[in-house]
């Protein structure tokens, strides 16, 4: 379940245990039952290869960029669309057959994406590749189930990883990109 963060709309995205991804537009105008006055509009964004239970729905830089993860064995667990769900790309790459619980894209470098799995945190710096290369990013954390990933933008984009039974860990994206570039000469200071 996720709501696209737009103050002028109320679009709700719902993932089911059966692998369906539903979009509810005008969700704030929904009324229960078979009410003809309900203005909520339901549509399916379910991909043809969606099998298993949806564990997370996240957005990229706009509402058309959607990341969906599944937490089952023996299936593809990471899907991405940049066209609002008209078509989906599988992004498991070299990831072992492990359930994926959550996903988070670096807002400063869209190529860098991290996932929370049954065996800790994994990352890629080439998400747009047809077969992204995933690497472990545990940084002192054991092979523990990650239940959620969150980003605190006001704290230099600090990432928090909630675990099953071992508390919460925090770190930063591993991007090589600097947050800020400063240059100066004798007469001026430039910040990019």
Language-model segment annotations:
Residues 181-191:
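Short, solvent-exposed loop/edge segments of extracellular or virion-exposed proteins
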Residues 1-182:
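Extracellular glycan-interacting surfaces
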């Amino acid at each position: 379940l996720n709501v696209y963060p737009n103050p002028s709309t109320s679009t709700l995205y719902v993932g089911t245990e059966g692998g369906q991804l539903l979009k509810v537009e005008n969700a704030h105008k929904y009324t229960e039952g078979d009410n003809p006055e309900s203005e909520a509009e339901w549509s399916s964004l379910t991909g043809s290869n969606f099998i298993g239970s949806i564990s997370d729905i996240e957005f990229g830089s706009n509402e058309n960029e959607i990341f969906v993860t599944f937490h089952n064995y023996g299936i593809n667990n990471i899907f991405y669309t940049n066209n609002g769900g008209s078509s989906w790309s599988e992004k498991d790459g070299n990831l072992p057959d492990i359930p994926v619980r959550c996903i988070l894209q670096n807002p400063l470098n869209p190529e860098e994406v991290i996932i929370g799995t049954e065996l800790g945190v994994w990352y890629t710096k080439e998400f747009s590749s047809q077969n992204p290369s995933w690497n472990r990013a545990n940084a002192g954390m054991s092979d523990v189930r990650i239940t959620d990933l969150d980003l605190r933008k006001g704290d230099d984009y600090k990432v928090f990883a909630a675990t099953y039974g071992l508390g919460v860990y925090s770190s930063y994206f591993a991007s090589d990109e600097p947050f800020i570039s400063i240059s100066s000469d004798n007469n001026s200071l430039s910040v990019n």
